[in-house]
Amino acid sequence: MGENTRPFPIQPWVGEGKLSQKMLGEIITWKIQGVAISHADLLSGLMASDLDCDVAKELAPRNAFARACSKLDSERIIRKIAEDHATITFQFTREANEGGKFHYYFESLLFLNKYSGSITSENLELEQLAKEEFGRCMEARTANDVTRLVQRLFERHADLFSIRDQGGVYFVPEVHNDFIVKVERFVRNIGGSLQRFPIPAGSPQGDRAVQEAVAHGLQAIIDEHLQAVQKFGEDTRPDTLRRAEEKIRTTKMKIEGYSFYLDKKREDLEASLQQASELLRSRMSFLIGAPSEEAELVLV
């Protein structure tokens, strides 16, 4: 950086209270060191930061199992062949080079419970081997696991609005400032870092950028609602329909809560959410036999 003898523009404000203007929120980004973090250290960090420890239990077993498979695939091929709401089924196939040609022999199917992490197989030797490696991978969490954990914390207790299409940099509304402090403490407790960049209101560029980030993030949520409802069919469970209804209700509350940022974009978002609501009402009417007008959706 070259030498600059001009006064730094913010310098005269320091100590005079001129920075205490209304804040829109903060742009945050975090970095987790690329070393394995024990499950115990994660729990300790969450507890010390007064954060929800249950999210550590929700780190998907499938991610740990994928890492375990990389240790188990010597001379075998492992493929996912089926998945339902609770279980993923994998096929283990032994690969052998015989007479200059590869031959493939079915070994066994292995079943992974997506929630409990339990592993079962008719091949008890393979089951035990998979359990041992899976246990090691569940205990040692990666930086990607921690990033998903942080995102899950915000999903439960606040909101992250992506600034970049690639992710990694987010806007967090000012109302969640206290929660950012807790997450920052947690990230530092486990050896990472979290950078915070406060965004004051009143700058045309800043106001517009925040508005676009919040509107884009909310529209992405609505698009997810639409895509999910469009896939609902005769095998869709009633509790799945009710969860979709609750998600739409929650999104409506978010649009209302963040109306300060949205201005005229609020109308577009409400119209888009209305479309998702009407589609869900129609599907509920067809699937559970209730008249369309009796589907108790928050948007009518």
Protein language model annotation of sequence segments:
Residues 1-3, 299-300:
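Non-Sec secretion/translocation targeting segments of pathogen effectors
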Residues 151:
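Active-site nucleotide-donor binding segment shared across nucleotidyl transfer reactions
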